[in-house]
């Protein structure tokens, strides 16, 4: 008997996913059907979810953000499709093959070490820029409305990580206020935060072309991931870096320096430092403790491939520190990776040596590894008991079925 599992035939590209989404939508006789839910059905059918995810736009079920989880590492079954879904906005009200509002599939860099890049990838026509530690804000116009999102969230106002309450949209507005605040009238300053936000953003997009999509990096003192720029930008720093402009019709990246916006330069919006050769660039990041690394732009036919290079110190930090503001979330993440060469004790020793540990009923400190392991084991036992009590095994079919009674 052949006991091998059947192989899954995955969609070859995004268009095949879109086509099947239309098919499912048209086959459902339900007034409450949505393209977003039909798209999720397609992803689940091929077991692509949650490696590829769907985010809905507020009050719109026909426009979605399709993005991957950026964590798959080596993936062979559907790598090309996975790469296409790095971050792409789809509008299902448009005609087939015309659904892509904007794609950032080639805007998320692939991390490589310095030696690999020099030996296997380098070309003297590559363009090299300084990388910045922050959150990318994507700005584009669709149906006469400007949108501000991140690579995994349609609305920057709903996106947050480093700060418990302040969103990336809030930080973006604070930065815009630094640049445009003096242009506001007393009446405008007296308006609600949401109204002031709209005014600031309208000033910000006044110089932008609706046919283009733009990418900016938020560099904010409350959005620190690896690099704290206080020593070079000052206390409570708030900066915006314009890193890319893309033609939405051809998906071709513009040269960021030949197309830089003078209006932005005049108000203080930054552009990335450009290097004339890779030797100077590597020397710069090795000698500058506040450098996050390099972004390499390599032209490939009609597209641009991005690579990110950092020092070994930065690479080690990103590999070993999840950088979540909640230390215990980081400890849980380290535990889940289950690496023998890097444990919870190593994480605590490196990054939180003064952690305050919980105390048991006898007044003794609870070992963090024991605490997390006990927590996970308890959850596993509970899930197993729930599963056993709510399902029945059918030997004829070799599967479990949920008891709905």
Labelled PLM ranges:
Residues 2-405:
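Core nucleotide-handling region used for phosphoryl-transfer chemistry
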């Amino acid at each position: 008997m052949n006991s091998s599992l059947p192989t899954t035939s995955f969609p070859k590209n995004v268009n095949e996913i879109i086509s099947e989404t239309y098919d499912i939508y048209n086959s459902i006789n339900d007034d409450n059907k949505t393209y977003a839910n039909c798209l999720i059905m397609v992803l689940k059918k091929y077991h692509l979810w949650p490696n590829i995810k769907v985010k809905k736009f507020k009050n719109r079920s026909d426009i979605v953000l399709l993005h991957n989880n950026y964590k798959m590492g080596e993936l062979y079954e559907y790598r090309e499709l996975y790469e296409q879904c790095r971050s792409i906005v789809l509008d299902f009200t448009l005609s087939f093959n015309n659904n892509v509002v904007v794609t950032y599939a080639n805007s998320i860099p692939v991390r490589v070490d310095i030696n690999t890049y020099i030996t296997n990838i380098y070309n003297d026509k590559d363009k090299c820029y300084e990388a910045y530690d922050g959150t990318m804000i994507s700005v584009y116009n669709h149906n006469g409305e400007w949108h501000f999102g991140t690579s995994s969230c349609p609305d920057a106002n709903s996106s947050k990580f480093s700060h418990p309450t302040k969103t990336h949209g809030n930080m973006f507005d604070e930065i815009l206020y630094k640049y445009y605040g003096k242009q506001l009238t007393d009446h405008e300053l007296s308006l609600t935060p949401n109204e002031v936000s709209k005014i600031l953003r309208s000033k910000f997009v006044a110089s932008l072309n609706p046919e283009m999509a733009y990418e900016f990096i938020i560099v904010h003192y409350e959005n620190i991931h690896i690099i704290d720029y206080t020593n070079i930008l000052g206390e409570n720093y708030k900066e915006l870096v314009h890193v890319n402009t893309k033609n939405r019709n051809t998906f071709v990246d513009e040269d960021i320096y030949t197309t830089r916006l003078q209006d932005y330069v005049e108000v203080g919006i930054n552009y990335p430092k450009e290097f004339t050769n890779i030797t100077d660039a590597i020397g710069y990041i090795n000698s500058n403790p506040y450098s996050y690394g390099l972004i390499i732009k390599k032209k490939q036919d009609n597209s641009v491939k991005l690579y990110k290079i950092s020092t070994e110190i930065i690479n080690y930090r990103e590999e070993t520190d999840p950088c979540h503001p909640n230390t215990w979330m980081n400890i849980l993440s380290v535990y889940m990776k289950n690496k023998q060469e890097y444990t919870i004790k190593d994480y605590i020793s490196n990054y939180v040596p003064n952690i305050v540990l919980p105390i048991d009923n006898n007044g003794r400190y609870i070992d963090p590894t024991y605490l997390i392991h006990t927590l996970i084991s308890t959850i596993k036992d509970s899930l197993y008991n729930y599963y056993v009590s709510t399902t029945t095994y059918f030997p004829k079919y070799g599967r479990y079925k949920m008891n709905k009674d």
